UniProtKB/Swiss-Prot annotation:
Subcellular locations according to the entry: Cell inner membrane
Species lineage: Bacteria, Pseudomonadati, Campylobacterota, Epsilonproteobacteria, Campylobacterales
Name listed for the protein in its UniProt record: Phosphatidylglycerol--prolipoprotein diacylglyceryl transferase
Family: Belongs to the Lgt family.
Organism: Helicobacter acinonychis (strain Sheeba)
Positions that bind a 1,2-diacyl-sn-glycero-3-phospho-(1'-sn-glycerol): R155
Name of the gene encoding the protein in the UniProt record: lgt
Length: 283
């Protein structure tokens, strides 16, 4: 065992406390993710106004819609897909966003689904642009290029919060023995960091490549969707399946199945973009 393997034994997921309210590193990481995504988008608007012909005040309004859609979709998606007591929440809807436990202690809102957040994001984006759908693909492209680096911090937050842990490392995996993290006396892959790299850094590079080589609105969000789906599908082989769900046909996890649906949605957006989007004008 090396020092990295046992890092959780020396790390507190709580960053600090404000009275009875405990502030977790995950919450701080999520806040960083939002800030990074926001300012990354503003930078893209400033640097490439032909691809992103959006006024800052309009983007600020849209960003609020998008973030609200993500949070609502992520939480509701978790309840519908992953929560074993979903029937309780469906009959006590106000409890879905209740940050306090039965004793009145602040515990925050726990349980978010990325794919649920994606659905909420798409719905919010459509509602915001419903009167001018020509701008929809521009906004989606803007989020596609600004989201991945923020996503890195989200997964780092999962790691710091000691959740969404990886699968048990095989004893004959030399690399796994080096990078694994001890969780409940088992050496597991740091799947959160693997996801941060694959679904964040690699997907960001994919979208940046597409930005350089494509001239049609809507293609960046397609590249993001396909790239994320592929990277998530791979990363799931290192992530422990949700205990309440397990695996399905062909030993696929729920994350992998939802990623396949994400491919279908991305191809649908591609079809829409090729039929309805205009070429980006050159200088």
């Amino acid at each position: 065992m090396n020092a990295w393997n046992t890092i959780y034994e020396r790390f507190n997921p709580i960053a600090f406390s404000l009275g009875s309210i405990e502030v977790h590193w995950y919450g701080l990481a999520y806040a960083c993710a939002i800030v990074i995504a926001f300012y990354m988008a503003l930078r893209m608007i400033q640097k490439d106004p032909k691809r992103f012909p959006v006024a800052r005040k309009d983007f600020e309004s849209y960003f609020l819609w998008a973030e609200l859609g993500i949070v609502l979709g992520a939480r509701i998606g978790y309840i519908l897909i992953y929560e074993p007591n979903s029937s309780y929440y469906l009959t006590h809807f106000w409890q879905i966003f209740n940050p306090f436990d039965s004793h009145g202690n602040f515990i925050g809102i726990r349980g978010m689904s990325y794919h649920g957040g994606l659905v909420g994001f798409l719905i919010a984006s459509y509602l915001y642009n419903r009167k001018d759908l020509k701008k929809l693909l521009i906004y989606l492209d803007l989020i596609a290029i600004s989201l991945p680096l923020g996503y890195v911090f989200g997964r780092i937050g999962n790691f710091l919060n000691q959740e969404l842990v990886g699968r048990i490392v095989p004893k004959d995996s030399h690399l796994g023995q080096m990078i694994g993290i001890v969780v409940d006396h088992e050496l597991r892959y740091p799947s959160q960091l693997i996801e941060a790299f694959l679904e964040g850094v690699i997907v960001f590079l994919m979208v940046m490549w597409a930005k350089k080589h494509t001239k049609t609105h809507g293609l960046l969000i397609v590249v993001y969707g396909l790239g994320y789906s592929l990277m998530r599908f791979i990363a799931e082989f290192y992530r422990e399946p949700d205990s309440q769900l397990g695996v399905y046909f062909l030993n696929l996890s729920m994350g992998q199945i939802l990623s396949l649906f994400m491919v279908i949605v991305s191809l649908g957006i591609l079809l829409y973009a090729t039929k309805n989007s205009k070429k980006i004008k050159e200088n």
